[in-house]
Regions:
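Short, small-residue-biased leader/transition segments that mark boundaries at the very start
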Residues: 3-8
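Short, functional "switch" segments adjacent to catalytic/cofactor/reactive centers
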Residues: 12-16, 20-21, 25-46
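Active-site-surrounding "flap" and adjacent substrate/cofactor-binding loops of secreted or lumenal enzymes
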Residues: 33-46, 75-99
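Alpha-helical solenoid repeat scaffolds, predominantly canonical TPR units
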Residues: 80, 210-213
Length: 217
């Protein structure tokens, strides 16, 4: 019947979309837990637990894909958050848009904070919340003073302006970034990420940080 055919077509669309949602991030550790060090020179690291993931396309996955994973496979989502924490520890900064197991400057927001923050608020297992918070806080409260590593993608873009004015003004051309003219969008994305960080700070009992983050939202 036409009704049965319509149901079947919807099922195909649904399960195709569900399948496609699992393409990224991709597992990057071997069966023994070994993986290439993030932003490194080929050094091989070893996972103490779980799977190491790379290629976090954080344009919009923090809005839909990772919340979906938090429902369907929370332990896997925890491994992904743990992988981001490891990247931050190995490279010195929580990455903005980690691809090819390295930093990039190709993102106007800082949505690893949103992804990890969502996992913390939902009590997702598999990673250390305090270690994660230390890295998240650094991204939100500090500007990278090293021009070389900043150019490579370490630290938020235009943070001097954002910390001074609570927004990124039009006059700031946001140099050393793939996107240089999205000042309004960048401000809105940072404000969202800082709101998420505020909720994490509140959950972890960091009252001063909670109040400070809300000033940017």
């Amino acid at each position: 019947s036409s009704a049965a055919s319509d149901v079947y077509k919807r099922q195909v669309k649904f399960y195709s979309a569900l399948y496609n949602a699992h393409f990224l991030p991709r597992a990057f550790s071997d069966v023994d837990g070994s993986y290439p060090r993030f932003d490194g020179d080929g050094q091989i690291m070893k996972m103490d637990h779980g799977t190491y993931y790379c290629d976090f396309s954080q344009w919009d996955t923090y809005r839909a894909v990772h919340p979906l994973f938090s429902i369907l496979t929370p332990s896997r989502n925890g491994d992904m958050a743990h992988s981001l924490v490891l990247k931050g520890q190995q490279g010195g900064w929580l990455p903005i848009f980690p691809s090819w197991n390295s930093y990039t400057a190709a993102m106007i927001g800082d949505h690893c904070i949103a992804m990890i923050g969502d996992a913390i608020v939902k009590d997702t297992p598999g990673f250390d919340y305090e270690e994660a918070y230390t890295l998240m806080r650094k991204n939100a409260f500090e500007a990278n003073p090293d021009s070389g590593s900043y150019r490579d993608g370490k630290g938020r873009r235009a943070m001097e302006s954002y910390l001074k004015y609570n927004y990124v003004p039009l006059e700031d051309q946001v140099t050393e970034a793939f996107h240089r003219r999205e000042q309004v969008s960048r401000t809105l994305e940072y404000a969202y990420d800082d709101f998420v960080l505020a909720q994490v700070a509140k959950k972890l009992g960091k009252t001063d940080d909670y109040k400070a983050c809300l000033l940017y939202t």
